[in-house]
Amino acid sequence: MQKVKIYEYESPCGKLWLAAKKGNLCLCDWAGSKNLTDTLSRLSKALDIEFILPETAPVEDKKKARPEKPAKVIVSAKKQLGQFFNGRRKTFNIPYQMAGTPFQEAVWKSLMDIPYGKSVSYADIAAKAGYPKAVRAAANACGDNALSVIIPCHRVIGSDDGLTGYGGGLGAKRYLLDLESPQQRLPFKTVTNKPARKPTAKKPAKKTTKKTVKKTPAKKPAAKKPGKKAPASDGIS
């Protein structure tokens, strides 16, 4: 297993980690990406390499006359990235190596066809890659891109112009899009995770006042007055 050193590049919108194997750039990813650990693990298995992280890299021996120099492709990548961020470069001329599934690599190759200063939707990329119904999978493949900026996944946005999902953060994505096409600043909107709405307390139901109908007691039938007794007969007819 070959040991590969990771080099750092400070861009105006975040730190990038760069690495190469046999003269080909295999890593250009954001140091703060939440997917970085998974990306390094995937590349290690696919390319049979062991990454030496910047934090664990051995300190150069000061007695050495010639300290270790980065590979030419790393030097070239840093130079071209500097030109890109200064607005003096629109495309990259760097040998690179992809490491993914056939579907992922089809998506990444489609990303390379997006012109500088343009943006497309995830549905467009899925269709371009030959999988028009796999929009969600295409979005995930963009997230697995290990060569950010070089392979411009930042040019893919939501169908509603929303800046959804990016390894370097939405701020970096907006920065890159504004850098490439300042006149398109207004249409883009940043989609943030809206806090869940607190359930509104149910208002107590209004008590319906029942009209009580007073029942008037039925009138007792009046007692019949005793009739007058006829006078007793005296026997005379």
Residue ranges and their predicted role:
Residues 133-175:
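Short glycine/serine-rich loop segments
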Residues 118-127, 148-154, 178:
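A short, terminal or domain-edge coil/loop segment
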Residues 162-198:
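Phospho-regulated, low-complexity intrinsically disordered regions of nuclear gene-regulatory
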Residues 1-132, 183-237:
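Basic nucleic-acid-binding alpha-helical/helix-turn surface characteristic of O6-alkylguanine DNA
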